[in-house]
Amino acid sequence: MFDIRKYPQALAVSQSAALTPEDYRRLYRQSVEDPDTFWAEQAKRLDWIKPWSSVQQCDLHTGKARWFDGAQLNVSYNCIDRHLAQRGEQTALLWEGDDPKDSKAITYRELHRQVCRLANAMKARGVKKGDRVSIYMPMIPEAAFAMLACTRIGAIHSVVFGGFSPDALRDRILDADCRTVITADEGVRGGKRIPLKQNVDKALASCPAVSSVLVVRRTGGDVAWTEGRDLWYHEATKDAGDDCPPEPMEAEDPLFILYTSGSTGKPKGVLHTTGGYLLQATMTFKVVFDYRDGEVFWCTADVGWVTGHSYIVYGPLANGAISLMFEGVPNYPDTSRFWQVVDKHQVNIFYTAPTALRALMREGSAPLQSTSRKSLRLLGSVGEPINPEAWEWYFEEVGQKRCPIVDTWWQTETGGIMLTPLPGTQSLKPGCATQPMFGVQPVLLDEKGKLIEGPGAGVLAIKASWPGQIRSVYGDHQRMVDTYFKPLPGYYFTGDGARRDADGDYWITGRIDDVINVSGHRIGTAEVESALVLHDSVAEAAVVGYPHDLKGQGVYAFVTTMNGVTPDDTLKAELLALVSKEIGSFAKPELIQWAPALPKTRSGKIMRRILRKIACNELENLGDTSTLADPSVVQGLIDKRLNQ
């Protein structure tokens, strides 16, 4: 097992933090022992039109979750209108374009005007409460306007990441039965143009029910036009009126659908509802990031992913925060871009993914040295377990040992952060998601579904409902029950493995299907990956299992080296020795394949499912590859595979 290093939080952090360790323990205890009282108190963070008749009616055996039944509220009112009196002239969205010369600040008053105009324009085009609207946009302010305008009139948005192919977009439009699409002529990313309108046109060739397409003019590029269906966004909103009354919504009315890839079959449309989701996003944003008035918060995600929904748009704006929206990529025009943006906008809280950090770590410290980053107070990690090496680089180099790191674990299906250290309440451990958020009751179960007490490793499950819980898979409720509630009756099944240490802290070890059983030893792939990337020559590693004649399963590692490193047998021997030292000789990879790049989704997650197929020589059906950022990577790995 790894040596666990602990980083006590600096006295300055503890003294200024909103919560003490005692506060956390007291509030957590109340949240699990008396959840109705706790959540009724937390719900005061929102403005309600009508109070609830019951706080919750939930049953994890069936997946039923109803929170704040009978209550009414409006999401856009909570994110905009209620702030106008006190902070109408404060910045709400700070936009940084792909080109460093492009940026703009949008106040809460301007946000209100833009959202109302678009909401009125949508109503004029026949969009009404309950209708589904597909949003296929670049990272520009209009993407947030579109989401909020839907919530204002009670339409259900389905945001599709702008990197998805026309086929993937088509499938999502058809699955949600969207009649309206909001898009842009083109997107801009890393200096390149992305043909969004062209992709929409291709998708809509198979979607005859779509009657309305609003198009934002982002680049002014030439686009094809279908009269009667297509309308320029600026023309639709020009005379639409600056006020649109917010539609009162039931707490359990659907708010949005967000598609997440299933390991098999078509993507799942995860459905979230209005009251519970907004409370989860609002509370976790405030508590986890210890947000203080006037601070600049930057989540580097795209609004096409749940992280962008919860921590670019809804969580920050419901709290009256300043939220930075970034159109670009970490390495354009060069690899100091993130840190240049931090200095330019005096960012206080920075929330990004381990994949981005590992890529930047690979470039060394020179890109950091051209910037000050003195404005930073808190750092966050999201999307996958962060390996200790990347954590330490983030803490020591990016945050200059001043900024605590909140290593957050959650999922599209949970709506908001579930496990995380809180600023000032405990020591930090590199790579450890530590403690549950209020109201979250994690448990570990063995293969037979038996509870594991004390330190141990097993399947991570949640034993009581929380407000941000998934309510359904759109159009296929049984699929939700089968996926999340059938595998472990009475629990929400996360699909992730975890271990609990002697302090009771949780370490995410990777997906359950990322556990390899070698000669009876259960090995978490994340642990082997963390050992491999401890080597100075290794930039990234992905580990999967494959059938082994003697051991049942063997360990197959795909390893990407640092720039300038030529992989050879000496490096291979050093890596095997490192895994032996860090975990044990039983965890040593049988096969190490040098990989110039790994297959990743456009959100930066490694597609381990494809790597497993390559390692197992199962090449006839690689499954859905539409989410890959660079599909050509896969063929290169197949050609050089070691298990032929």
Swiss-Prot record:
GO molecular-function terms, A-Z: acetate-CoA ligase activity; AMP binding; ATP binding; metal ion binding
PTM description: Acetylated. Deacetylation by the SIR2-homolog deacetylase activates the enzyme.
Residues the record lists as binding Mg(2+): V533, H535, V538
Amino-acid positions noted as binding ATP in the UniProt annotation, renumbered to this chain: G383, E384, P385, D407, T408, W409, W410, Q411, T412, D496, R511, R522
Swiss-Prot/TrEMBL cofactor(s): Mg(2+)
Enzyme nomenclature, EC number: 6.2.1.1
One record GO biological process: acetyl-CoA biosynthetic process from acetate
Pfam families, per database record: ACAS_N, AMP-binding, AMP-binding_C
Catalytic reaction list: acetate + ATP + CoA = acetyl-CoA + AMP + diphosphate
Gene Ontology CC terms, in alphabetical order: cytosol
Keyword Transmembrane helix: no
Database matches in SUPFAM superfamilies: Acetyl-CoA synthetase-like
Keywords (A to Z) from UniProt: Acetylation, ATP-binding, Ligase, Magnesium, Metal-binding, Nucleotide-binding
Coiled coil: none
PROSITE patterns in alphabetical order: AMP_BINDING (PS00455)
The name this protein goes by in its record: Acetyl-coenzyme A synthetase 2
Species of origin: Pseudomonas putida (strain ATCC 47054 / DSM 6125 / CFBP 8728 / NCIMB 11950 / KT2440)
Taxonomic lineage: Bacteria, Pseudomonadati, Pseudomonadota, Gammaproteobacteria, Pseudomonadales
